[in-house]
């Protein structure tokens, strides 16, 4: 650690009134670009307007100005998020059965949307129990509201109004920090101060406030709710906060206040800061006292982490020093120069953040079902399936975004003259080895994983079940996964002596937990069927990575096109007269990567949906007999391609296909409509620009004949635009089809 002399106290970090607020400017489409601001000559203008409106790099090359625009746009984004949240809470307050659900969450479904009768749409208002008719929601809001101690619709109203106020504040902040007091570039590049605020402030104090809220408000209210007290009889949140005796009745150690904390007698707090593990048998969720303890611990960690870096006081680590000291045996100059890259290229910074956040989102998807955090979440199968699917898709998109911005960084921000023999340079120098090895891995995984299925389909067709790979014939048990499960199941009392239960029931060993006659969670068995589909996961993930990584590593140059960097991030082909150079731009790799990402995530959510219905979700009789939704058919049916088509896609589509005339009929229409949107994409993906230009010209001729030709000349979409429209409809159509299929099925049978 280097101790430097303290820097001068006051730095002026903002410019006052740098950009005047002008409504005339806002009213002029394309004011950010000289060409676009001239107005439309051809229909391509509207596409360029949309493509470049938020591409701040194309407006100016001044990094400070770009940074200010991005910063201001973030406030706009936060404003939209607050507005959306406000809408969710408002629906809970105005149109929902939240109070009824709170009184009986096992028999009443959550609903926060009631359809108005105009021409018969009121059929969509299904009976969700307790005499309430509405659309069943699967977002998990009811469960999170209960966990946070909300007991009335009035509280939801107040929160909704609060969120609206915050949305307004964010809009104001976005305007203020661009037009009135805009930060200087030095402020955006002061990473140590940023770490201090983000780690200690956002994550540290944020977690601490949440832990405080949980201890003082959520825990006592949930204890009353679990005991069956009527929500209207429970004291209001502020009474718990202001009146310590009220809490001391539930948790006697509260009477001692902060004394145990300062006398280091912390075990006194073990009543409400627990380390139980497992699930609460009443609600089927994690113990809320465990969650409070967790957030307190996280807060301490991040408060410490936020104070490790050198800010105005001359003590602590400098990030540049840390990075430059980081040299491995094979990495040459190591991370030298990385500090400069990450403080001058926001694309590089964003790429890292997207990769991390995308991975984290996928981790969240897997924990939401294996360690369900909110009360009664585990028995709401529709919500469980929705949350898993949602977080998987979001994670997939964020990871593709990481590759996109890494490639933009390579094209726009990377300076090969100043980067010599550092980590990135070394990776680029042996990119051929990386890509060819990855390609080999993809071929190996593809042939072997698919080959196992094809073998099974063939043996099945020939009537030779004894020659199939299955749990009852030739076993391919996932022994490593089973070993991991077993290690975790046996951890309490062994490798984790402090824990009473393993982290998740899914590991095995423990009993099942049932709430209101429905299975919340039980040990999940893994067998040959899972071994097969996991290798399909490995295959699709590796192909996605191959496409995206090739796009990044060859973004600036390749043997085929040595001067690729000059052509930019997106271009259709390397100019006229050079055949075989189409689909080589970095943008095209993102385009192709999106399809494989869609492929990969689809297999994951199909696997999850079927596995849970077959081996986990179901009802339990008074005698303790579990009946699963699809009766455990996953292990024998999913080992052939035909089984996936017949027993998953076809068998489980019956609910969405037969939904007409029921409250689920909207899903039937979405299922049809989204198939149409998906098919529509193929028109853009399978036809060339020339075909459409030719067609347009004869249509324009007809308009001229009738003297109704427009002043703006119609043009066919460019090649890149056509691909963009195509992939968008492909993904949206595919995702909405899956959504309708999943929800109609799980709401009908779950």
Curated annotation (Swiss-Prot):
Its job = PsaA and PsaB bind P700, the primary electron donor of photosystem I (PSI), as well as the electron acceptors A0, A1 and FX. PSI is a plastocyanin-ferredoxin oxidoreductase, converting photonic excitation into a charge separation, which transfers an electron from the donor P700 chlorophyll pair to the spectroscopically characterized acceptors A0, A1, FX, FA and FB in turn. Oxidized P700 is reduced on the lumenal side of the thylakoid membrane by plastocyanin.
What is the source species? Drimys granadensis
Broadest EC class assigned to this enzyme: oxidoreductase
Co-factor note (free text) = P700 is a chlorophyll a/chlorophyll a' dimer, A0 is one or more chlorophyll a, A1 is one or both phylloquinones and FX is a shared 4Fe-4S iron-sulfur center.
Instruction: Report how it sits in the membrane.
Output: Multi-pass membrane protein
List of residues binding [4Fe-4S] cluster? 573, 582
Question: Listed GO molecular functions?
Answer: 4 iron, 4 sulfur cluster binding; chlorophyll binding; electron transfer activity; magnesium ion binding; oxidoreductase activity
Q: What is this protein called?
A: Photosystem I P700 chlorophyll a apoprotein A1
For the ligand (chlorophyll a'), the binding residues are 675
EC number(s) per entry: 1.97.1.12
Q: So which domain of life are we looking at? A: Eukaryota
């Amino acid at each position: 650690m280097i101790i430097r002399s303290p820097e001068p106290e006051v730095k002026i970090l903002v410019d006052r009134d740098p950009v005047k607020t002008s409504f005339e400017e806002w009213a002029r489409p394309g004011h950010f670009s000289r060409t676009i601001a001239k107005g439309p000559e051809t229909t391509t203008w509207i596409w360029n307007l949309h493509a470049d409106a938020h591409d701040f790099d194309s407006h100016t090359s001044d990094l400070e100005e770009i940074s200010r625009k991005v910063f201001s746009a973030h406030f706009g984004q936060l404003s939209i998020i607050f507005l959306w949240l406000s809408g969710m809470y408002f629906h809970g307050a105005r149109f929902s059965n939240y109070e009824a659900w709170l009184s009986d969450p096992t028999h009443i479904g959550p609903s926060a949307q009631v359809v108005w009768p105009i021409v018969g749409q009121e059929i969509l208002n299904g009976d969700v129990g307790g005499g309430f008719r509405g659309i069943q929601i699967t977002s998990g809001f009811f469960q999170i509201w209960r966990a946070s101690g909300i007991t009335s619709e009035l509280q939801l109203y107040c929160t909704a109004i609060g969120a609206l106020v915050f949305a307004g504040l964010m809009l104001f902040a976005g305007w203020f920090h661009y037009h009135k007091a805009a930060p200087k570039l030095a402020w955006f590049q002061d990473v140590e101060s940023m770490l201090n605020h983000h780690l200690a402030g956002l994550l540290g104090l944020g977690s601490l406030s949440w832990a405080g809220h949980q201890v003082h408000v959520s825990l006592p209210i949930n204890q009353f709710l679990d005991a069956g007290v009527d929500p209207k009889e429970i004291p209001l949140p502020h009474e718990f906060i202001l009146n310590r005796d009220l809490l001391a009745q539930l948790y006697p150690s509260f009477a001692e206040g902060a004394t145990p904390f300062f006398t280091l007698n912390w075990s006194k707090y073990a009543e409400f800061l627990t380390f139980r593990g497992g699930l609460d048998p009443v609600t089927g969720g994690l113990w809320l006292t465990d969650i409070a303890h967790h957030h307190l611990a996280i807060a301490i960690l991040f408060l410490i982490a936020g104070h490790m870096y050198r800010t105005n006081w001359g003590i602590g680590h400098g990030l540049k020093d840390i990075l430059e000291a980081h040299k491995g045996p094979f990495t040459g100059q190591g991370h030298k120069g990385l500090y400069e890259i990450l403080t001058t290229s926001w694309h590089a910074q964003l790429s890292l953040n997207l990769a991390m956040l995308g991975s984290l989102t996928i981790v969240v998807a897997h924990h939401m079902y294996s360690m369900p955090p909110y009360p009664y979440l585990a028995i709401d199968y529709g919500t469980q399936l929705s949350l898993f699917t949602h977080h998987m898709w979001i994670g997939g998109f964020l990871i593709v975004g990481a590759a996109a911005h890494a490639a933009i960084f390579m094209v726009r921000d990377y300076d090969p003259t100043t980067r010599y023999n550092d980590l990135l340079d070394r990776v680029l120098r042996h990119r051929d080895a990386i890509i060819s090895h990855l390609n080999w891995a993809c071929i190996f995984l593809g042939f072997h994983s698919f080959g196992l299925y094809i073998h099974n389909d063939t043996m099945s067709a020939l009537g030779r079940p004894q020659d199939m790979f299955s749990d009852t014939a030739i076993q391919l048990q996932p022994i490593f996964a089973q070993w991991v499960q077993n290690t975790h199941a046996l951890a309490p009392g062994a490798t984790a002596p402090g824990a009473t239960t393993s982290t998740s029931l899914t590991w095995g060993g423990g009993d099942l937990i049932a709430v209101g006659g429905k299975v919340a969670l039980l040990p999940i068995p893994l067998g040959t069927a899972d071994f097969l589909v996991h290798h399909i996961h490995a295959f699709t993930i590796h192909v996605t990575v191959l496409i995206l990584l090739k796009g990044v590593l060859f973004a600036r140059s390749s043997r085929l096109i040595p001067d690729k960097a000059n052509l930019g991030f997106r271009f259709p082909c390397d100019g006229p007269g050079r055949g075989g150079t189409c689909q080589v731009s970095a943008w095209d790799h993102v385009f192709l990567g999106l399809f494989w990402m869609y492929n990969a995530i689809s297999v994951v959510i199909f696997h999850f949906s079927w596995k849970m219905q077959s081996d986990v979700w179901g009802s339990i009789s008074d005698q303790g007999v579990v009946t699963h939704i699809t009766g455990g058919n996953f292990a024998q049916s999913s080992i052939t391609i035909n089984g996936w088509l017949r027993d998953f896609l076809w068998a489980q589509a019956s609910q969405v296909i037969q939904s007409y005339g029921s409250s689920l009929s909207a899903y039937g229409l979405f299922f049809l409509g989204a198939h149409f949107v998906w098919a529509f994409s193929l028109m853009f993906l399978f036809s060339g620009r020339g075909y459409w230009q030719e067609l347009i010209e004869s249509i324009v001729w007809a308009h001229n004949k009738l003297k109704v030709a427009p002043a703006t000349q119609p043009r066919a979409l460019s090649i890149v635009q056509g691909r963009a429209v195509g992939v968008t409809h492909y993904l949206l159509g595919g995702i909405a089809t899956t959504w309708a299929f999943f929800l109609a099925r799980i709401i009908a049978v779950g």
